[in-house]
From Swiss-Prot:
The keyword Glycoprotein does not apply. Mg(2+) binds at T26. The keyword Plastid does not apply. This is Elongation factor Tu. Residues 19-26 are annotated as: G1. One of its GO terms (cellular component) is cytosol. PANTHER family: ELONGATION FACTOR TU, MITOCHONDRIAL, ELONGATION FACTOR TU-RELATED. Residues 61-65 are annotated as: G2. It comes from the Bacteria. It holds the Pfam family GTP_EFTU_D3. Monomer. It is found in: Cytoplasm. It comes from Lachnospira eligens (strain ATCC 27750 / DSM 3376 / VPI C15-48 / C15-B4) (Eubacterium eligens).
Amino acid sequence: MAKAKFERTKPHCNIGTIGHVDHGKTTLTAAITKTLHERLGTGEAVAFENIDKAPEERERGITISTAHVEYETEKRHYAHVDCPGHADYVKNMITGAAQMDAGILVVAATDGVMAQTREHILLARQVGVPYIVVFMNKCDMVDDPELLELVDMEIRELLNEYGFPGDDTPIIQGSALKALEDPNSEWGDKILELMHTIDEYVPDPERDTDKPFLMPVEDVFSITGRGTVATGRVERGVLHVNEEVEIVGIHEDIRKVVVTGIEMFRKLLDEAQPGDNIGALLRGVQRDEIQRGQVLCKPGSITPHHKFTAQVYVLTKDEGGRHTPFFNNYRPQFYFRTTDVTGVCELPAGTEMCMPGDNVEMTVELIHNVAMEQGLRFAIREGGRTVGSGAVATIIE
């Protein structure tokens, strides 16, 4: 059967359900697809069973089960991720396997805020999920409006505590199960209200081409009489010939240079776009003044740092990780973009050691600078073997 062509007519947004186990994340995901399909005639309804038995994927050596569904509102096309298990969420968010432009936090009105509700909000904050919209589920099982109000307050306080705008965050009350049973009921209206709220509250994500230019340097060579060429894959933004860029990373100082030519597959280009594997000819740069591990970027868009806090997932033995815990002052390699940098891990006060399978916040000090920003992903390696995965949470220096 021929595959349908993906029509890019609407803005695209990546979204996902987060929240405590059994609060109804997967039921809500199914209810959204069914309600939008029946009420707006968009997309396809995906059954609960098909979301729940998500296939295992391997992302950077880590086994993650994730279900991907898509749906559309009148305004946008959404790609939605839902994970069956709590550990899958932790891995997913930290590895950036599924980058989210926004999260739908599902909280059961019958339980209120639970342990994983808290952990998922913390993770969302640490890895840089910019927006959260709340769906208070199972409201059909709560008769007391005062109880709903208490849960509402509890959620807002928690969001504030982790640096989200709790007072202004939309909270939609509904029942995913009732909406799934009858999308045309008032419970179905609540699903439409949720999606309309997400359309309005979450701004259109910035496209990769609109972001400031960045290309990690993979290789460097010199062409006699022409200068030095840095090669790599454009991560974001657009580069034009004769534009000025900065060389950032490894050293304290930042060097400005002009790109006098761009090549791809031995052909000359006027501009390079995200995903292009290019060679950038740099004016007046010596072969030894730029190296793998640095980046070329739009001037002023990213700065070099060596000390930061990070949210880290430690691989289990089965995932090919360590068989034993590690302790404070552990010194592995941190793999950023194209290169390994040695660093020292400082565990949180009161944490003696870190076991395989743990998710931990740590402070890291690298032996030299890396072009860094919040949300940047990295791998932790020992002798070329990946033993952990992380995201930069805050930059210290």
